Amino acid sequence: MKKKVLVGMSGGVDSSVAAYLLKEQGYEVIGVTMQIWQDDEEFIEKEGGCCSLSAVADARRVANKIGIPFYVMNFKDAFKRNVIDYFVDEYMEGRTPNPCIACNKFIKFSSFLDKAMAMGIDYVATGHYAIIEKHNDRYIIKKSEDDKKDQTYALYNLTQFQLERTLMPCGQYKKSKIREIAKEIGLRVHNKKDSEEICFIPDNDHGRYIKNRFPNKVREGNFVDKQGSILGTHKGIVYYTIGQRKGLGIAFGKPMYVVDINPFRNEVVLGDLEDLLNTELIAKDTNYIPFDTLKEPMEVEAKIRYSQTPSKAIITPIEDGRVRVNFHEKQRAITKGQSVVFYKDDLLIGGGIIEK
């Protein structure tokens, strides 16, 4: 009997080709677009993004073309609770969230997988660029064939339970080949551009988005230097992130950067580039893929943002499942709330959320 797989289809080229590849490999494929858009004008404005109504139309058209059933499933409440509310709360606390990592952790590989299992379906699949393999008794994640498109940074939270039930067929290919396959089989989405912004924010202006939702909570405050001297007025801490230089709305005669955010005092601390450089961080909420827990110091390559090349570091376990990360070289703008992710060559070791 054919194994069944529920493919999350965003209307983009990657998930479309993932569905096609799995069908070619002999799976019984069912396409699903997750309805995560909220009942407000933000999502109407956002038409064309991976959460929009036009994305549903694209996904349905692809499903018809490759001959698989297609459904829209409602994940609105779970998405609002685990992604949107988390996103807003983090900015309010002076941290910089990563909504894609939260979505992978709580929606795509949790709520979506739960739905598949309740329906008696064997696997879920996505268009992620990553490779899942089984080594001995353990599932591992390796970087994809396409280094530029590799998405392992956002997958460090996956558990053995989830990996055993997840397929990522695009990981074996370069993006150019995925587009080529889409064109060969006549998919109109073959040249659809990649969505790079936050799916639920129409213009990528997260400050405006939060201000519109919670006008009473976003208040003006002071820009200060490291000594606490007032330098000017900011429009609300949710508009800023560590390392930011542009959009401060104030001129200093020299480049100034956001080096800290103090939510309790409603202050944004500005400093020089040198103030952004650091070699150490502490991360919490850690998860490891090739093993359950880190028991002793380990040499890895680590990165503190999605688009960065990993740098050499030593990770050391400390109390409460947290980890200390010591980089060999200074890192620019280590940002609370973002994830630090560890590798050994092309093997994903794990990661955690930067605490300090």
Curated annotation (Swiss-Prot):
One of its GO terms (cellular component) is cytoplasm. The record marks H128, Q338 as: Interaction with tRNA. Keywords: ATP-binding, Cytoplasm, Disulfide bond, Nucleotide-binding, RNA-binding, Transferase, tRNA processing, tRNA-binding. The keyword Zinc does not apply. GO terms for biological process: tRNA wobble position uridine thiolation. Residues 149-151, 305-306 are annotated as: Interaction with tRNA. It catalyses: S-sulfanyl-L-cysteinyl-[protein] + uridine(34) in tRNA + AH2 + ATP = 2-thiouridine(34) in tRNA + L-cysteinyl-[protein] + A + AMP + diphosphate + H(+). The active site is at C103, C199. InterPro entries: MnmA-like, MnmA-like_C, MnmA-like_central, MnmA-like_central_sf, Rossmann-like_a/b/a_fold. It is found in: Cytoplasm. GO terms for molecular function: ATP binding; tRNA binding; tRNA-uridine 2-sulfurtransferase activity. It comes from the Bacteria. ATP binds at G8, M9, S10, G11, G12, V13, D14, S15, M34, G127. Disulfide bonds join C103-C199. Its EC number is 2.8.1.13. Transmembrane segments: none annotated. CDD domains: MnmA_TRMU-like. Belongs to the MnmA/TRMU family. Catalyzes the 2-thiolation of uridine at the wobble position (U34) of tRNA, leading to the formation of s(2)U34. NCBIfam families: PRK00143.1, trmU. This is tRNA-specific 2-thiouridylase MnmA 1. It comes from Clostridium botulinum (strain Langeland / NCTC 10281 / Type F). The lineage of its organism: Bacteria, Bacillati, Bacillota, Clostridia, Eubacteriales. The gene is mnmA1.
